[in-house]
Structures are given as structure tokens and as C-alpha cells.
Amino acid sequence: MQPLRSLCGRALVALIFACGVAGVQSEERGFPPAGATPPALRTGEIVAPPTKTFWPRGSNASLPRSSSPPQMPKGGRMAGPPARTLTPPPCEGPIEIKDTFKYINTVVSCLVFVLGIIGNSTLLRIIYKNKCMRNGPNILIASLALGDLLHIIIDIPINVYKLLAEDWPFGVEMCKLVPFIQKASVGITVLSLCALSIDRYRAVASWSRIKGIGVPKWTAVEIVLIWVVSVVLAVPEALGFDMITTDYKGNRLRICLLHPTQKTAFMQFYKTAKDWWLFSFYFCLPLAITAFFYTLMTCEMLRKKSGMQIALNDHLKQRREVAKTVFCLVLVFALCWLPLHLSRILKLTLYDQNDSNRCELLSFLLVLDYIGINMASLNSCINPIALYLVSKRFKNCFKSCLCCWCQSFEEKQSLEEKQSCLKFKANDHGYDNFRSSNKYSSS
């Protein structure tokens, strides 16, 4: 009996040790937790996609916790009774991403890369070449497309490589640059959508503001502010992300992640509150601003509908089309980023490391998170497609530009530009007559 008990004891110790090693390895190559993730965000979850994960509740650590014994105080005795910690039961198997999701993520990323470069570069070319497309809303859309293009060119290829190679060979500089560009791109998207919603309300509320050709000074100031604020808000990503080195199965792996031990109190607070900050500013803010100003715009249009003349019908139709286009862009943004933010919030609110059913929840959240990553990446290429489907003017310009890319854009669009410019002038003349008649009638 004694040899049998000794053998069972050794087997039990070996099993516990194996589970501990598996947990440490899983944590070392784990899924970026609350503080190490954004929505790209356009964010750290795409910088270091996981193959295995271990999520401690309320922790932002991605490194194994220290297993050293507690320090002995002076005198050789502990200050109190030894603390007893309840270790949660280990999962039956590692929570990991299967190869199927890797292939799906790679295919989606390649599609986003190709469609995003073609769509956003074509959109920028249309607005740059076509003089009648150079107005306030379209310049904001061009700013949004430029931010998406930077994210697509720099971030997506590196993210695909990181997922397949499970190593970070690009150095510390790229480890800081990739999440910085990704977060700046998301900030440009969010603030541009907010500016577009406000611009549409101003266009409807002030009927004397006729849409013309060229970039208004206020729009130029808005674009500069959007880029400056987006870059400033992305600076904590560059400061917080770092590259660590760890040994795994005899191999030396380099991992890029939001470091679990930050140097300053501000960065420690940022790491702790990052998911809630991303959800509130980068997701809820554009939706709230769009809902508020579009409600005001609808009330304004219903109130002033009786005072419109037939001469302004074409002008109002153009404004309604632009308003519909902006609303479509905001809706696409919400649909693309909802799964990723939902997985983060569910992880923060529902996960409990002492729950016996936490392994099933981890598997669900990991799948939901990867779906969210792919959906968020899709937002970088879907805006030109949405403009093509919603706006007739953009649809005609896309057809002409894509079908005749090697030909001179001015030669193909000269007649359409002249007709559009004459149409604007006619609308302006009709509106001036309408204002003059109202002025004399009121007098």
C-alpha cells in the first residue's frame, strides 16, 4: 500500500505541476486582456492575436504572475497566519484559436487590404481630380479615407504575419508604431463622422449656406483639429506598448503587448480603464452625436418644409442625399465595431475566474473577439462601398474612375463637371430670388 500511495502522490504532484506550467505558457502567449486591447481599436488586439488565452478576472497582466514565496519580515516570522488562496479548477483543455479562424482571419485581411487600397485610393482620386466634388463634406470623407488607407497599408500586413508566425520580429519601434497608427486611424474615423453629422445639421439649419465649390476655411480647421486630436489620443498606445521576450518550448519568442507594469500612474490608470474609455469615446460618442444632430435636423426640415419653393427642390435633394450618405457611414461604423466592443464589455462584466463554467465563457468570448477583430478591420474598406451604393454622384464617379483609370480623368468628366457647376449656379440663382421675394414680402 505504501508504494501505491507514494506513486499516487507523485502522479498528483506531477499533474498539478503540468497544469501550472500549461497555465504559465498559456498566459505568456495569452490573449491580450482588458488593458492590452482596444477596436485596429482600427488597438492592441490586432497587434498580438492569440493562439491561447488565460483571462484572470480584473487583471490586465499578460505575463505570468510571480510564484516566489512571500518575503519574510525581519525576525524570521510571518506577520500573520499564512494566506490561503483558492485556486480555480483548471480547464480541461487550453482555450485556443483553431487553425480555421486563422485562415478565415487571413482571407478577410487580404480582402480588406485589396478592397481598401482600391476603394480608398479611388475615393481620394475622385475628390482630388473632380473640382465639383471638392466641398466641405467630401473633404471630411477624404480625410476619413486617408486615415483608413494608412491603417490598411501599415497595420494589416503586420497583423496577418503576427497571427501566423506567433512571433514579433519587427522590433520595439514597430511594436509602438502599429497600435499608435491603428488608434489614430480609429480616432480620425470617429471624429470625422462627428464632424459630418454636425455639418449636415448646419447645412439644413442655415438655409443661406449654399453648397459651393472649394474647401471652406472652417472645414480645413476641422480637419487639422481632427488629425491633431486623434494623434494626441493615440500617444498612450505608443507609450504603453512594449516588446517582451519569453521562452516557450525551448524557443525564444518576442511578444508585442501593452506592458502589464507601466512606469507612470497615468499609464497604469490608462491600462486599467482602457476598455471603458474605448467603448465610451470611440464607439458611443459618434452614435450619440449623430442621433442628436440628426434628430435636430429632422425637426428643422419638417418645420421649414412649408417655406420651401420649387426652385430649391434640387438643392434640397442634394443635401438630403449627403445626409443619407453620412447616416449610412455612421451605421456601417456601428455595425462593424459592435462585436469587438461587446466582447470586451462582456469579458469585463461576466468573467469570474472562480466560476466552474468560465472555460465555456472564455471559448465564446475568444470566438466573439476574433469575429469583432475581422468586423473592425472590415470598416477600413467598406466606406467607399457604402458611398458607391448610397450616393448616385459617387457611384457615377467610381464607375468612370475605375473603368478609365489609365485615361485622363478630366477628359472623361469635363462635361459632367460643367453640368454640375451650372446646376449649382442655377440653384444659387433660384435661392437668391427666393430670398429676395421673401425679403420684399416681409417688408
Curated annotation (Swiss-Prot):
GO terms for cellular component: plasma membrane. Gene3D superfamilies: Rhodopsin 7-helix transmembrane proteins. It comes from the Eukaryota. The keyword Ribonucleoprotein does not apply. InterPro entries: Endthln_rcpt, ETB_rcpt, GPCR_endothelin_rcpt, GPCR_Rhodpsn, GPCR_Rhodpsn_7TM. GO terms for molecular function: endothelin receptor activity; peptide hormone binding. Residues 128-138, 199-219, 298-325, 391-443 are cytoplasmic. The modification Phosphotyrosine is found at Y440. It is a multi-pass membrane protein. Keywords: Cell membrane, Disulfide bond, G-protein coupled receptor, Glycoprotein, Lipoprotein, Membrane, Palmitate, Phosphoprotein, Receptor, Signal, Transducer, Transmembrane, Transmembrane helix. GO terms for biological process: aldosterone metabolic process; calcium ion transmembrane transport; calcium-mediated signaling; canonical Wnt signaling pathway; chordate pharynx development; developmental pigmentation; endothelin receptor signaling pathway; enteric nervous system development. Disulfide bonds join C175-C256. Glycans are attached at N60, N354. Residues 27-102, 165-176, 245-272, 352-363 are extracellular. Non-specific receptor for endothelin 1, 2, and 3. Mediates its action by association with G proteins that activate a phosphatidylinositol-calcium second messenger system. This is Endothelin receptor type B. The gene is EDNRB.
